[in-house]
Design a protein with these regions (language model features):
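Bacterial N-terminal signal peptides
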Residues: 10-19
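OB-fold and OB-like single-stranded nucleic-acid-recognition modules
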Residues: 23-206
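Bacterial N-terminal signal peptides that target proteins for export
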Residues: 1-9
């Protein structure tokens, strides 16, 4: 039991260290290509919290449950981090769809190459937010390119060197699976839950 807890602690600390560096704009001395499908993760899988649970395709044969951002914000959170190798259970096995949400921030995580996004129920910049992520995995290549192209239409550049807070929130739709992260520095001050949609794909509306 003690060794399992020690492994969890070490993994969480490693993940936290990489996330803090990534969020502070560190590129680890590597210039990543602009093509999001060619981004190469620098963070080792072992340092990624619950890596196997996050990196999976969204089931295409599972009808999505319609929810809102406010529903995710209300989901109960575990008081202690789940084990670093915890498989998906319960709510995490479901697919969810958000027909109406707003994109507030987006960037490419310099450690694992996932596209990080913060969404809210309203366009208000102070509204509570939820993190959603589109993974680096090859099956999400077209989804990542779509995000990049749609943001470009709004004069916002997204690649491994560019991103951040949007000048104004953009309406979007989201399809993804619930994922319970752990409490660490992982976004803006408006992020109000450790629950995410990860993996997730988005469609930014005109």
């Amino acid at each position: 039991m003690k060794s399992r807890y020690r492994l969890l602690l070490i993994g969480a600390l490693l993940a936290l260290s990489f996330r803090m560096l990534a969020c502070s704009g560190q590129d680890f001395g590597v210039l990543q290509p602009e093509d999001l499908c060619k981004c190469l993760p620098i963070e080792p899988d072992i340092a990624d919290y619950r890596h196997a649970a996050k990196h999976m395709p969204i089931p295409s044969n599972m009808p999505p449950v319609e929810i809102m951002v406010t529903d995710i914000l209300a989901w109960p959170q575990d008081p202690l981090p789940l084990p670093i190798d915890q498989p998906r259970t319960g709510r995490e096995l479901q697919v969810f769809h958000l027909a109406n949400a707003f994109l507030q921030e987006t960037s490419v995580n310099s450690a694992d190459c996932d596209v990080h996004m913060e969404i809210s129920q309203t366009a208000d910049k102070n509204a509570p937010r939820v993190i959603i992520e589109t993974p680096v995995d090859s099956e999400f290549c077209s989804a990542r390119q779509q995000i990049q192209a749609q943001l470009k239409q709004h004069n916002f550049r997204l690649d491994s060197q560019h991103g951040g807070e949007l000048p104004a929130a953009l309406p979007l739709q989201v399809l993804g699976m619930a994922f319970e992260d752990f409490d660490h520095s992982r976004g803006s001050a408006q992020v109000a839950t450790i629950w995410e949609l990860h993996p997730a794909t988005v469609n930014i509306l005109p």
